[in-house]
Amino acid sequence: MRVLVPASLLVSFAANDGEELATMSGTMAGTLARLPAPLRSPVGSGTEVPTVSRRHVQVGVATMGVLVGAAALDGVRTAGRSRFYQDVQRLFGLHAYGHMAAALLTRGYVSGVATSPTVVLPVWWWARSRLRRAGVPDRSSLPRAVLVVGSWLVLSHALGAIWA
């Protein structure tokens, strides 16, 4: 349990972000174009659809990988008890719902949606149940997780834009 449960976060990340590495730069324009009109205007003028380069995605995924790797190591170090590990595990699990909601909203494939219900959610549910059965208290905090992971996500996109 000490290694396997925190390591499952890395497996989940590798699957989901591997899918994003393979598909995001090629599908982003189509995804944004399929958004309902009221949601398109904040991301562009409606005439040009923003895209992200493959390099941007590579840098962003690598940067997020540092955060997820650090969280998994902290999870191993604390047998899943650390707030940092639990926050990242929780938010990574929850983010799968965002992929699925985006696919429903755009009525099509969005990068990351294939591994969200097949890997990310089952791994997250399994990890939570294993921690609960082991008597590990849930110390995660959604606001704290959003602050930490969200800030890191902004950093990952900024670095991706700089190095693209």
Describe each PLM feature range.
Residues 1-164:
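Short amphipathic, positively biased membrane-proximal segments
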